């Protein structure tokens, strides 16, 4: 199972990538194994923990659709979910985000030895003219590919 965030490649310039675990409940995990996930408007934030001097990473707006065979009365599909990272990783990410004005964006979700992992990328948002340029470049590359055949 591998789910990618195609919109992130279009909206952001993706840089360094990080693998993180994610805290899910049972029905969410089954739904994630089934591929019922939407990552289009999701992002990650690093916030202070309730423990003094520590940080926590959270993913926001990650939409995991309800599992069909579970009790979904009080289920919130867009709730914030905790990411599992070491404190050294969190501190280095936070300094990079502050100094270079970057954001953490989820780019993929996959399984690794039975555990669900989320791939995050340090990214900078593209402006509208940069998006247009990338579309033009893709079109030109496609035309060149067709012409060479």
Describe each region flagged by the PLM.
Residues 1-149:
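Ribosome-associated RNA-binding proteins
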């Amino acid at each position: 199972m591998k789910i990618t965030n195609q919109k992130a490649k279009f909206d952001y310039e993706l840089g360094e990538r990080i693998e993180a675990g994610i805290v899910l409940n049972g029905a969410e995990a089954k739904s994630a194994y089934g591929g019922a996930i939407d990552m289009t408007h999701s992002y990650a934030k690093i916030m202070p923990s309730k423990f003094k001097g520590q940080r926590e990473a959270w993913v926001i707006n990650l939409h995991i659709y309800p599992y069909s065979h579970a009790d979904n009365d009080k289920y919130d599909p867009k709730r914030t979910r905790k990411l599992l990272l070491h404190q050294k990783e969190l501190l280095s990410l936070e300094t990079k985000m502050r100094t270079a004005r970057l954001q953490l964006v989820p780019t993929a979700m996959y399984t690794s030895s039975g555990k669900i992992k989320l791939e995050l990328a340090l990214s900078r948002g593209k402006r509208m003219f940069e998006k247009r340029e990338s579309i033009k470049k893709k079109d030109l590359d496609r035309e060149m590919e067709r012409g060479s055949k």
